[in-house]
Amino acid sequence: MAEVPELASEMMAYYSGNEDDLFFDVDGPKQMKCSFQDLDLCPLGGGIQLQISHEHYNEGFRQAVSVVVAMEKLRKMLVPCPQIFQDNDLSTLIPFIFEEEPVFLDTRNNDACVHDAPVRSLHCTLRDAQLKSLVMSGPYELKALHLQGQDLEQQVVFSMSFVQGEESNDKIPVALGLKAKNLYLSCVLKDDKPTLQLESVDPKNYPKKKMEKRFVFNKIEINNKLEFESAQFPNWYISTSQAENMPVFLGGTRGGQDITDFTMQFVSS
């Protein structure tokens, strides 16, 4: 912040010298014969009067603002002359001194802002349109099969996180992690074909608001059914086979032999 200089000697020459009422006359060294206590407005035709209170003499910023405003900003208008310069008076003068300008923050490359944002998550299970549940088959594979009774405890509980992505009215970007495991569903290219896999991650860094694109799925709701489209590979969906006990995979067709419709059941934390 720039320093406000002390009152110049030329200005001090216009100082009245009265201990009780100190005035400045903008037009010259003529002491004004009026009191701030008797006037609500100081007309500029009679000169601009400034009262400096000894009680607030050490508050240099207030004093400087009074002088600057009177000499530079209030020359063309009528201004109230309060008995004592108060905090609320300063707040009303600030807009006349400083010009307000909008500040635009470019966050396109500011990943730190996104990383620090809280991630909203929920726990759920998924079943396909044939009511097959998803279960673990080996350390890095999911299969779909029918479960009943106590076997339902085998189904995978997902931690669905709402992440950054191309959100629209019908698409919500999410990441699908496995509850209590450091595994996330991700989409990668293998043998020139989009492929679904379970990928191990560092729990210190995941989940996060800005997930890598291979982890992001667009959750689409149609007729109370859900589809999960890969953000990395548009028009490719989490799919199951018509057959029992087959791996969950990434399919490129909808409404055909492969099942892309799921129902979601919420699970309490």
UniProtKB/Swiss-Prot annotation:
One of the record's GO molecular function terms: interleukin-1 receptor binding
Gene3D superfamilies to which the protein is assigned, alphabetical: 2.80.10.50
Subcellular location: Cytoplasm, Cytosol; Secreted; Lysosome; Secreted, Extracellular exosome
InterPro entries: IL-1_CS, IL-1_fam, IL-1_propep, IL1/FGF
GO biological processes: cellular response to lipopolysaccharide; cytokine-mediated signaling pathway; fever generation; immune response; inflammatory response; positive regulation of canonical NF-kappaB signal transduction; positive regulation of cell division; positive regulation of immature T cell proliferation in thymus
Site entry: Important for interaction with integrin: 171, 179, 181, 190, 204
Keywords from the named record: Cytokine, Cytoplasm, Inflammatory response, Lysosome, Mitogen, Pyrogen, Secreted
Pfam families: IL1, IL1_propep
Signal peptide from the UniProt entry: none
Keyword Nuclease: no
UniProt record similarity statement: Belongs to the IL-1 family.
Subunit organization: Monomer. In its precursor form, weakly interacts with full-length MEFV; the mature cytokine does not interact at all. Interacts with integrins ITGAV:ITGBV and ITGA5:ITGB1; integrin-binding is required for IL1B signaling. Interacts with cargo receptor TMED10; the interaction is direct and is required for the secretion of IL1B mature form. Interacts with HSP90AB1; the interaction facilitates cargo translocation into the ERGIC. Interacts with HSP90B1; the interaction facilitates cargo translocation into the ERGIC.
Further facts: IL1B production occurs in 2 steps, each being controlled by different stimuli. First, inflammatory signals, such as LPS, stimulate the synthesis and promote the accumulation of cytosolic stores of pro-IL1B (priming). Then additional signals are required for inflammasome assembly, leading to CASP1 activation, pro-IL1B processing and eventually secretion of the active cytokine. IL1B processing and secretion are temporarily associated.
Protein name in the entry: Interleukin-1 beta
Taxonomic source organism: Macaca mulatta (Rhesus macaque)
